[in-house]
Amino acid sequence: MLYCTLNVQRGELMIDIHSHILPLVDDGSKSVDMSLEMLDQAYRDGTEEIILTPHLAYAYGFDNPREKIENLFEEFRNIVWDVGIPIKLHLGCEFLYSSKESFEKHFKDITTLADTKYLLVEFYFDVNEDVILEAVESVLEKGCIPIIAHPERFEAFQTNTELAPRIIEM
């Protein structure tokens, strides 16, 4: 398979901070080839850096603790280098927040976005406002900054227009 190494006109730096490209670890890419095709297309579309954010969601069977995904990430990054896709890869995770207890229990397994203080957090679709606020507080207490994945999916944001501004103020 041949991958793009075209000189694409670049404008501002584009970094994708949420992707399911790390192969065979969650509901994203189903193979290494699929992942390489996804990265190649992202590069062609102007993405220069991408954070691979596999699900860390034990309730859904996505058992992807830090050590496991770090090893898989290194293997995959070497493959990407070998085929010559000129895109910079970083690691993170998308953590499914269900309760403060679960968050505390699994915090050691969490990988922040590109080794920064930003943490990508997802919720069950029927999450209520109190759990969202608890999650934000819990993440902040750990010295991290939460980034809520797919806020448009949650009724709490749709029905309470003050929720997002309230979170930003925290």
Predicted segments, located by residue:
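Extended substrate/RNA-proximal surfaces in nucleic-acid metabolism proteins
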Residues: 62-170
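An N-terminally biased module of ancient metal coordination in phosphate/nucleic-acid-related enzymes
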Residues: 3-85, 165
